Every structure is written in structure tokens, then in C-alpha cells.
Amino acid sequence: MFLAACDDDPFLVEWTENPQEAVLFALDRDELNSASAYNMLARLQVVIEDPLTEGRWDFAVDRQNGKMVFLPPRVLGIPSKGALVPFPGMEFEEMQRAPSDTLLYVTDKPVPVELGTIYVVRTHEQIGSYGRICVYYGKLEPLEIDLQAGVLRFLQDTSPVCNNRSLLPPR
């Protein structure tokens, strides 16, 4: 039997911060089928050449003009809400809320990957609880950029709350 107090919010998503590291490989590497994209909510490395991924990723990484860059899906011709906002000089723990100004989100051009910068990521649209169409917000911090090898190691965490810009769990 399920009992709830009158003050309980049945739609409240209880979650805790859980930053995790991930590694991605630049698209221009010679090896085929390397994970070069990332799904923030699922915390999955994605091989974008795999037809089963069907654009279910939020950004890819590549090397362009001597720099490592994030590629929002639209840069590669994938219709998506996936986007990034860089915040230079900010600490991972300081980033508590994704910006509400949609004009800040980069959707259509490469975003340089820089150490010492935190990136807010808006995910691709996906079906959330109760059948709603949702985007989710997360943050990431590049930890290591190996430009020669085309490898990026980063720390990320994502809120599992549909369409909610808060990057911290409810208190």
C-alpha cells in the first residue's frame, strides 16, 4: 500500500549529485567506431557512426584548427535541442543553475574546449516521466585534453528533472 502525506509532492524527483568522469575521442581519429559523442542524461559514450544512436547524444568532440572542440548536434546536420554554454573561470561546484537566456546556448558552431571553463549542456529532446517531451541540463568540466591523441577526459553531472535548469538537487 502506498501512503503519502498531504504535503508530499508526487512529482518531486529526489536525486543526489553524482559527478562522473568520461572519456571521448575526436571524430577525426583514424580508428572507426570510437566513442566521440556523449549522452548526458544516460551518462553514455556514443559512437555516432552507429545507426542505432539516431541522434540520441548531446555533443561530440573533434579537433579543428589546432584545438579540441565540442560539436553540438546541429553542426553535424542533426536536428536537436542539444547545446552548450561556456563559463570561463568558473568552478564545477559554483555552477548551480543553467541560464534561462536561450540565446546564450551555442547550437550551430563548434565550441572550443578549454581547461578552466565549465560548460552547461542542454540535452537533446527525449521522453521523460509521464510521457512529457523534456530537455535536461547538466554541467561538465574538461579535466585533460590530449590534442595530439585526440582524447578528452571530463567530469560531468546532469539533473534528472525534466525541463528544470537547477543543477543541484532539491533540499
What residue ranges belong to the model's regions?
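Surface-exposed, beta-sheet-biased, low-hydrophobicity segments with strongly acidic/polar composition
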Residues: 6-171
